Amino acid sequence: MNLALRFSYFGDRFSGSQMQPGLRTVEGEFIEACRRIQVFDDWREARFATAGRTDRGVHARRQVCSFLTDLPERAIQVLNRVLPGDIWCTGWAEPPEGFHPRYSARSRTYRYYFFPAPEKIAAMNDAAQVFIGRHDFSSFARSSGRDPERRILAARVFLEGRFAVFEVTAESFLWNMVRRMATVLEAVGSGESDAAEIERLLAEPTEQRVAAAPPWGLILWDIDYGMTFNPIQIDVKSGRYLASRLRYHAVMACAADRLAPDDRAV
């Protein structure tokens, strides 16, 4: 059967998600785990594919892959035990015939987290609305010969604790597009730019692209296929890994705060 799996990962210890010889990647680890439990031998024959690639340092909450296997139950029940701690499956589905995780997606949603939250959240949210609709995003991405036009379905900026969150949904995105959009919105939040600048960049595309925000704030948040995924229990190993990362970064944040000079900006 063709099995679709939804999974999550921390991106900071991977050289991106796409398989690359000699480098640790999400796809490489996932395929190796599938081979170890013998749900398939050759990823090409199994037609292994993911919904899309993420760059080095970018995280995913709901990435999706699919592959052909005669042992779907083994994949569902065992895969989390053999995957490394920074990748874990969260759901499975038997998709309809002709399903492809990349081309069957109705929409994709990303979130970019800003810390500390800029002061002008309302202005950022208003500016984010300018992105909605179909536009030429040449100023916000490297199209690499692809059509630079994309249709943004929804965009908003809101507070979540001490963070500002930029959430954007589209049918598809160009390379580094969300991170460059985040850069401009952060400038709006600090008062260095405004919605009119975004309107200009969309109306008058330029080869001098906006710089990309750092990858660690970006999460592939969700992908909509119009189908329901059945839950998969997270493995104890990944649960411990998540708890360990939370403790580590909480302590590091405290240390950075205590070690910073008194005239620090944060």
Segments the model singles out, each with a brief description of its role:
Residues M1-V266:
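Structured-RNA-binding interfaces characteristic of tRNA pseudouridine synthases
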